[in-house]
Amino acid sequence: MPAEVGRWLRTVLAEVQLATSAVAAGDVARFDEALLRARRVYVAGQGRSGLVARAFAQRLMHIGFESYAVGDIISPAVGAADVFIAVTASGRTETTVSQAANAKAAGATIVTLTEMESGDLVDLSELRLLVPTRPPRGPESEQHATTLFCQTVQILFDVVCAMLQQQLHQTDAELSARHSNLE
């Protein structure tokens, strides 16, 4: 059993390394720039993609951004100068596509993280981060369904947060002061 654990750790880490290295660094830099210009940031996704998106919204809040997970009852109206981030491996998740269309109609900048090079959601987006986690652009994963996609997006979000924290000169103490103290 311990050998099996080691094999899976090596497999998962190798897959994530291949997938993250295939993401265009220029697109990540443009994503970072869009966030720096944003008045507010909204994240959307369903299932595990939604959980990864919500974790990103929380970390953005720690850094000092006004950020919301779409669907939470405290989310204000989206509008111009806002950034709407859609996370969906398929790029076709109906709820997320509909939310992005509504945000676009309200004047928000749409950023999509997806495995797909084209589709309705990509067409709505000012910026698409292609997250290649399936052949032919990405690795053949031994993990179930969109597991590699979610892992890769989480790593990309963590990288962007590290960049933003540095660019905004936010210390760990400042982030910790914004962390929930109700736990």
For each predicted feature, which ranges?
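Alpha-helical scaffold segments in soluble metabolic enzymes
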Residues: T11, E15-L18, R30, N102, ...
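Glycine-rich phosphate-binding loops that contact phosphosugars or nucleotide phosphates
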Residues: R40-I155, C161-A162
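Residue-level signal for pocket-adjacent positions within structured domains
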Residues: L18, I73, Q143, Q170, ...
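A short, charged, Gly/Pro-tolerant segment at domain boundaries
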Residues: M1, Q165-E183
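A short, well-structured juxtamembrane/interface segment
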Residues: A19-R37
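Generic secondary-structure signature for well-ordered alpha-helical cores
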Residues: L18-A25, F65, T133, C161-Q170
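Generic N-terminal amphipathic, Lys/Arg-enriched alpha-helix
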Residues: M1-S21
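Hydrophobic packing residues in well-ordered alpha-helices of helical domains and bundles
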Residues: V5, L9, V28-F31, A53
